[in-house]
C-alpha cells in the first residue's frame, strides 16, 4: 500500500496538532472542579467520566498524522495509569506543554538534541526533588485522604479503601466488583483463598449450601496425581487415630482413591475432603509450596525424596479452619510467621526481577494470598452508567493509594510542581549549552501548567494565583474546591509522590521523542466507493 510522508516542520506540526486535540479533551477533567466528558458507545448507553485515561483511550482522529500524535500522548496517559494508577490528566497536560514550548524553539532553529538533553536534565533533578519531598503515610486517615482525592473527592470511596487496606494490609488483595445492590460495601475473605472446589459434592458437611467446613484440620499437600487408595492408606490411618478432619490437596485425585474417600466421608468413618491443586505447571508447584509454608506442612514430592507412604503426621499442614464449596477453598492458617515472612520476601524479590507483566500479576496474587487475605469492594449505583463511572473511580483510587503507601505523598493541587519549578530556579546551569538551557527553561515553565488548568477549570484566572503561590511560604496552595488558600498537607489535599513523579517523567519522554522527530510515515487511506456505486453498462444493452 502507498505511503504518505511528512518531513521536518510539517511532520512535527501535524503530530503536535493531534497531541493538542487529545490534550484539550482530557485536560477539562483535571482538579476538583474538573468537567465531565460524555463518550458515545457503539452499544449501550453513553459513558460519563472525569477519568483522564478513559477519555484518552476513546480518541482516534481521522487525519493519520494527527492521530499518530494523539496515540503518542495516549501512551503517556496509559503508561502513567499502569505505573501509578492516577495522574493521567496531569501527565497529558505536562506532555503537551513541554512539546508545545519545545517545538517553538525547534522552529526558531535551535538544535532539538540539545533541547532534549536540557529537558532530561531538568526532569531528573525534578524527580529526585519529588522523591525527597515525599512524606510517608501510615494512618488510616491519611490513606482515606489520598483515596478520596483520586476518586474525584468522593470521601465515601476513600473511607472504604482505607478500611479495606487497614484490614488486609498494604500487600493484601483488594479487588473491585460490581454490586447487585445500590450500596457500596466491603466483604472480606480471611486467610488464603484459591479457585478450586471439592472434587465431589458428597464431601459436603452442610447440605443446605453444599459446603465443607472443618475446624482444627490436617492438610496433606501432594504434588502428584493420586489414583489408588493403597497410596493413601498409611496417612489415612494416622489421621483417623487423631479424630481430626483431613483436607487433601493434590494434582488430581481419581479412580478408586476418590471413590474410597467419598465412601468413608458418607459413612462418617473419616472427615475428609479432596481438591485439585491451584494453578498450572511451575506455578502450581510454587503455590503448593506457599500452602505448605502457610500451614506449617511439607510438600510431598518425590523430588524431595518424600512419598505418600512415608508421610508422618508432623509433615502434614494444619489449619484453624477450612471452608470448601464447589468453586473455592479458604484456609485459615496456623503456620510459622517467620517462615511466612521469609517466603513473602522471596516472592517480592521475584516480582522486582521479572519483566513479564503476566508473571508479575501472578506473583502479586501469590504474595497477597500469603500475607493478608482478600477484601472485595462491591461498588453499587442507581444506574448502569453511574455504576461503570464509579467503578472506574474506585479502581483509580485504589491504585493511587497503593502508590502513596509505596513512595509517600506530596502536597497536591499542582503545588508540588510549582515548588519543584522554584527549586529548578536555584540550580546552577552555567555549564549547560545554550540549547540545553532552553530545554531546562521549558520544563520550568511547563511545571506550572497543571495548576493553571486546575484553577481555570474552577472558573478563575490562573496567573494571579500562580504568582501568589510563588511568593507565599512553602506548603500553601489554592484549594479549588473551597476557593481558599490553605496548607495543602494539613487540609488533606495530597498526591502520591509516585503519581506526580511518573506523570512528569512519562510526559517528558514522549515530548522529547516528538522534538527529535524528522519524518512521519503513514498509509494513504483508500477512498471508499459510494453506496449507490455506478455499475458498468452491459455492452450488449442499447439505449432505451
Swiss-Prot record:
Gene3D superfamilies for this protein: GroEL (3.50.7.10), GroEL-like equatorial domain (1.10.560.10), TCP-1-like chaperonin intermediate domain (3.30.260.10)
Protein name: Chaperonin GroEL
Primary location recorded for the protein, binned into one broad class: cytoplasm
Localization per Swiss-Prot or TrEMBL: Cytoplasm
Cross-referenced NCBIfam families: GroEL, PRK00013.1, PRK12849.1, PRK12850.1, PRK12851.1
GO cellular component: cytoplasm
A single GO BP: protein refolding
Recorded catalytic activity of this chain's protein: ATP + H2O + a folded polypeptide = ADP + phosphate + an unfolded polypeptide
GO MF annotation list: ATP binding; ATP-dependent protein folding chaperone; isomerase activity; unfolded protein binding
Protein function: Together with its co-chaperonin GroES, plays an essential role in assisting protein folding. The GroEL-GroES system forms a nano-cage that allows encapsulation of the non-native substrate proteins and provides a physical environment optimized to promote and accelerate protein folding.
S-S bonds: none
InterPro entries the record matches: Chaperonin_Cpn60_CS, Cpn60/GroEL, Cpn60/GroEL/TCP-1, GroEL-like_apical_dom_sf, GROEL-like_equatorial_sf, TCP-1-like_intermed_sf
Pfam families in the record: Cpn60_TCP1
Database matches in PROSITE patterns: CHAPERONINS_CPN60
Quaternary structure, from the entry: Forms a cylinder of 14 subunits composed of two heptameric rings stacked back-to-back. Interacts with the co-chaperonin GroES.
Protein residues bound to ATP: 29-32, 50, 86-90, 413, 479-481, 495
Keyword annotations of the record: ATP-binding, Chaperone, Cytoplasm, Isomerase, Nucleotide-binding, Stress response
Organism: Borrelia duttonii (strain Ly)
Enzyme's top EC category: isomerase
Annotated EC: 5.6.1.7
HAMAP family: CH60
